[in-house]
Swiss-Prot record:
SUPFAM superfamilies: EF-hand (SSF47473). Ca(2+) binds at D43, N45, D47, D54. One of its GO terms (molecular function) is calcium ion binding. This is Myosin light chain 5. Jaw-closing muscles. Residues 30-65, 100-135, 136-171 form the EF-hand domain.
Length: 173
């Protein structure tokens, strides 16, 4: 048994392991877990890879059903191969290099705002936060909303909220 492992390592397996493990050293363990949850949510057919159908299903679950095939193809072409979890981490590592936390939060909100209005219905956000990935409690969401600007129609200004979440105070106009 040990000789098989040794042969595998001598055959280049170790080099591949080193290359793939570098991406894991770029993130904290909690971040890797969050990426794993995001990957699992996107891997709709649970085959360990994100493909075009997974992307379509993910967009549909976010209410965006008019995404074009060429847009999906362009997203998939950003990867240098099939998008397994390691490739997913590599892609996000490259995208997040040089971005700050506020920009990252804003980009997440923008995914839920296909019209680019700068606001999202607070009830919709509350449902998502309580049902997806690291599920928040109603109390946690309500506590976050205390720092949010919400208009009379119930729309949350996510740009202002992103600023408060990352800087701890409202931006002075």
């Amino acid at each position: 048994m040990a000789s098989r492992k040794t042969k595998k390592k001598e055959g280049g397996g170790l080099r591949a392991q080193r290359a793939s493990s570098n991406v894991f050293s770029n993130f904290e363990q909690t971040q890797i877990q969050e990426f794993k949850e995001a990957f699992t949510l996107m891997d709709q057919n649970r085959d360990g890879f994100i493909d075009k159908e997974d992307l379509k299903d993910t967009y549909a679950s976010l209410g965006k059903t008019n995404i074009k095939d060429d847009e999906l193809d362009a997203m998939l072409k950003e990867a240098s191969g099939p998008i397994n979890f390691t490739m997913f981490l590599n892609m996000f590592g490259a995208k997040l290099t040089g971005t700050d936390a506020e920009e990252t939060i804003l980009n997440a909100f923008k995914m839920l705002d296909p019209e680019g209005k700068g606001s999202i219905n607070k009830d919709y956000i509350k449902r998502l936060l309580m049902s997806q990935a690291d599920k928040m409690t109603a109390e946690e969401v309500d506590q976050m909303f205390q720092f949010a600007t919400i208009d009379a129609a119930g729309n949350l200004d996510y740009k202002a909220l992103s600023y408060v979440l990352t800087h701890g105070e409202e931006k002075e106009e």
